[in-house]
Structure formats: structure tokens, C-alpha cells
Amino acid sequence: MSKYNFVFALITFLGMSFVPVDKKFPNLNLKTLEGKSVELNKSFAKNKLTVVSYWATWCSPCKKELDAVKNLYDGWKKDGIEVIAVTIDNAQQLNKVKPLANQKKWSYIVLSDVNSESLRLLNFQTIPQTFVVNNMGEIVYSHSGYTPGDEFELDKKLKSLLGK
């Protein structure tokens, strides 16, 4: 293996997140952009499936992923699938989130985790990080990173989980 291939493989491996599927999603209390507290596990119980996408305003692939998901969201919502976008922006960056979400016309729920509690409890280091959680609060799918077209893989996985 050439030196460059080895370095690429090492960087890819180190950038991966090791979040086991079938693990219970931690009981997190996050905030809406208006400052209201939301208990995620209660949100999961209201939907057949919930897509939880972790992102930040400074992360270009994150914004591309959320834009791509926006185009599929109406169909998902009809099938009982909710999308929750959780920003990990720190307190200084948080004032950029709401204007960005409004500008991009993201109609799904946007929450903030300024203390990065999710990263610690779910053991991931890279964003975007996407989880699919069932109504029992179990992680049934996890994906790290974004390449154009990943949203179609996610759509296919959601349909499979719904038995479609």
C-alpha cells in the first residue's frame, strides 16, 4: 500500500464514529432556538421514526445534507417520520443558527446542544452525524459524513424500516 493510501485510510478510520446500532438514544434535554426545553425521547415516541442530524453553521457538508433532506422531508412527514436538526454550535455561534435556518427554509425542528452533551453520550467526533431512531428510542441506523446522494441512501433505509 502506498504511503498516501495508508494516510488516507488512517484519516478515514480515525474520522469514523463508532455508534452501535440498536443502542438506546440517550435521554437528552435540548433547547429550541427560542430557548424552550425539549426532551428528545418524548419526541421519538410521537413518530414512527425520527431522523436526528447533528450539524454546525461552520460545517459546509452539514448544510448541504440538511438542504438535501429538506427536499425529501414533506414525503417523510406524511409517513410519520420527523427530522430534528441539532446544532452543536457554541454559545457565541448560536446567534447565527436561526437566521440560517430561516434563510434556508428548513421546516423541520432545529435544536441546540451548546454543551456538546450529545457528542459525549453518543461517542461521535465528526459531523454531520445522522441517526435514525425508532419510537422506542433505539438507534436503528447511523451515518457519518455527507456526500451528495447520501440522502437517497437514507430515504431508501427509512422506507425499508417502514416496510415499504
Kindly label every feature range from the protein language model.
Residues M1-K31, Y141-H143, F152-E153, K164:
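N-terminal targeting signals for export/organelle localization
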Residues L100-M136:
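Short, internal strand/loop/helix patches
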Residues N47-T50, Y54-W58, T126:
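Short pre-active-site segment immediately N-terminal to redox-active cysteine/selenocysteine motifs
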Residues K63-K104, N115-R120:
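Structural microenvironment flanking redox-active thiols in thiol-disulfide oxidoreductases
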Residues V132-K164:
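Thiol-/selenol-based redox modules, centered on thioredoxin-like
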Residues T50-V52, I84-V86, F131:
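Conserved hydrophobic packing residues within short motifs/helices of P-loop NTPase cores
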